[in-house]
Amino acid sequence: MPIITLPDGTKKIFEQVVSVEQVAKSMGLVKAALAGEVDGELVSTSFLIKTDANLTIITANDDQGLEIIRHSTAHLLAQATQMLYPDAQVTIGPVIDNGFYYDFAYKNGFLEGDLIKIEKNMHKLVKQNLKIEKFEMSRDETLQFFKDKGEYYKVKIIESISTDQILSLYKQGDFIDLCRGPHVPSTAKLKNFKLMKLAGAYWRGDSSNEMLQRVYGTAWGNEQDLKVYLHKLEEVARRDHRKIGKTQDLFHIQEETPGMVFWHAKGWILYQLVEQYMRGIFRDNGYQEVHTPQLIDKSLWEKSGHWDKFGDVMFTTTSGDRDYAVKPMNCPAHIQIYNQGLKSYRNLPLRLAEFGSCHRNEPSGTLHGIMRVRNFVQDDGHIFCTPEQIQDEVSTFIDLTFNVYKYFGFEKINIKLSTRPKKRVGSDEVWDKSEIALVEALNAKNIVWELQEGEGAFYGPKIEFILKDCLDRQWQCGTLQVDFSMPKRLGAQFIDENSVKKTPVILHRAIMGSLERFLGILIEHYEGAYPCWLSPIQAVIINISEKHAKFIVDIVKKLKKQGLRVISDLRNEKVSFKIREHSLQRYPYILVVGDREMEKGQVSVRQRGGKDLGAMSVGTFIKKVNQETLLKNQIK
């Protein structure tokens, strides 16, 4: 006679063994039930409860329910695929953010058109309302089962499992797959999905293994959520920085230099605007800007510990009998500057900053426009300080970071604090001081932050700053990392007030992280419609006829002299054609000059979006732009 306790404390008494589905039916939830959580363990609705237990019915409204839907849909994908392509071997199909994927080994290869066929077949299976049943077999029985089916990859997975294990499998129709589960009770629960794309993937993620084909999909608990997600993807595609970068002639990347950016003139203006703003931030907040070499002898990277941890992503070269690495980060070089001359405690905190160009040999499959590259510039800074100075420095940096993000239009910031891992260097006393300093600095700001216990680096705790863009996508940009290890490894010292040599703490800090990535985020956040102060071109001036050309040339000179970023279009084309063309470039202003404007020494001003501001003098227009522009006269 099991007594079932529900989340609200209600108790249900049953005369005999009862399934999760039967309990759900007694609650009027049988149609919504996808699975159950019995005493903290997720189980299928067919699971039998034999003794008293705590039970939560899992539905599509729960995060766990959504994950079960997605995992079950991955299996639906595998079933539908093998029905159409019997030679396709199944491998794995996990849940990922917003969806799932399944990897297949198929020598003929899938085409984009095949996804349409597979998706149609999946919908057919949904309509058939196939019951999804769990059963168990011994490891050896399961191994033989998949050997008989000729499923090479499933065999490989099972061979890695100890022989005494009992394995769970799920059956829907004629399709059987290895899985821990749980799954939804029937395919009818899997109505709201879409297959998204094909990609390549190595078996077990190892590039030395064979390449498989990965099919990505998304699945949701209801049709509306699916529509909202697909609409968001359309928004993302429309804002894709790669597309906008090409349309606005900002940058390109080519085959001969994968992961390295060719900045075009307008893109370089945008880059410089951001860099020069950050240079002012450095200057106004007590940082000394430095510059360090690109090539550094391998021996320094060995001393710093980077060779062991990052050697596989370093670009290297040999000259004579010496091995060099192109720097993947700037910190060891900054310590070399610090080490030039003995420092006193009176010199601390010492803040060094650099727009450091770094190279990392990232896998080609991870490269993505200017968001993920092999050559990037960091707004990198290192603060050399005492343990007692950590809190004040962290507090100042938090304010600085929030101000920078707000300046560029990002108001939603999440913060995560990662604390000591099991394997670490430094005494517990130093870790205590550092973590307390970070916690107190965060709490003093009265901001919400998330604790990630044990997620810090081996050399110190860290704070991560994650900004949200206009689509609520999260981007981890800023970091502040406490480091007890590297200054000691590289011999950084200072003389304390008692004339004793001590090792400083280093605070590694960056606000944007990679300038390239931050610019990609900006491009997508604004969809190429930058505020006037950030726009590479603030205005384009067009003539109605050829006789207005000289007047426009003089206006351009005058505007540029005042620090405005302007261009002219004097082509012998219709005004409407030129306005339409430049509107697509999303410049803040289009200025039109005809007979009336030339006679009065004015320009007719159209604001981005088509709003007509009427005619005004050149001086009035300059004042208007200067009022909007926070970075005027930076680039001329």
Swiss-Prot record:
Residues covered by region (Catalytic): 240-531
Subcellular location: Cytoplasm
Binding-site list for Zn(2+): 331, 382, 508
Cofactor: Zn(2+)
Catalysed reaction, written as an equation: tRNA(Thr) + L-threonine + ATP = L-threonyl-tRNA(Thr) + AMP + diphosphate + H(+)
Enzyme nomenclature, EC number: 6.1.1.3
Primary location group: cytoplasm
Keyword Ligase: yes
Subunit structure: Homodimer.
Protein family membership: Belongs to the class-II aminoacyl-tRNA synthetase family.
Protein name: Threonine--tRNA ligase
Source organism of this protein record: Vesicomyosocius okutanii subsp. Calyptogena okutanii (strain HA)
